[in-house]
Every structure is written in C-alpha cells, then in structure tokens.
Amino acid sequence: MKAVRERVLAVVDDDTRVLESLEDLLESAGHTVHLFRSAQALLADEAFGRIDCVISDIGMPAIDGFELERLARAARPGLPVILITDRLELIKGRQTTARDESRTFLLKPFSERELLGAINKALAARQRP
C-alpha cells in the first residue's frame, strides 16, 4: 500500500484570528501548516519550496492575494492557490476557468467542509498529468 504524504499548507492573512482559526482547523485535518502575516513573509521563507498549497486572504496591505498568486506561480508554476475574502466585489469576474483549476475562491464565512474540499480538489488537480 502506498503511503500518503502529509500535505504542507501555507496560510497568509494579516488577521491573527483568521490565522489561528485556520491553523487549528487544518492541523486537525492532518495537514502541516505554516502561518504568514504577509505575502512577503511567505515568499522569503525557506519553507516556500515545500508548500503544497497556499491559502491567502485577498485584501492585505503591500502585496494582495492576487499579486501573491502571480508571484508564487512565477516561482512555482502550478502551485495551487486558494484566495479567500469577505468582499464579493473582489472576485466577481475572476472566477476560475476550466483551464486553471489551480485557482479557487472562497467567500468568507466559509465552512470547514468547503475549505477542506477546495484544498483536496486543488491538490488532486495538481497531481493529474
């Protein structure tokens, strides 16, 4: 039987409460979680090369979630990025196309099931040839 590798997730948000809440949820689901208060912190961290999926707030100072997605994909093509926000207007017209399954949007508040489902879908899409 093939062993399942533990997934390494990065959560990026400037709100400490969101970071802590998502850390608890994702660790309880069996993932290794790295927390970052800014996009710059993630991109500069040595763990960036081992991240399997990024979960990032869109509305952050300096580098927002869209720019983080662009920079992360430039460094690591195909890296799944899940963008979260409580502002629907930020994601209107930017929904995922059939060609780009590595981009996912979640509107806050989202359920545990929605987030874990989005992570599983993003990781499965990345593993397809």
Question: Where do the protein language model's features map onto the residues?
Answer:
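Acidic, metal-coordinating helix/loop segments flanking the phosphotransfer/catalytic sites
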Residues: 35-53
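Receiver (REC) domain active-site loop signature in two-component systems and cognate sites
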Residues: 60
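As written
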Residues: 65, 95-106
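C-terminal output helix
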Residues: 110-122, 127
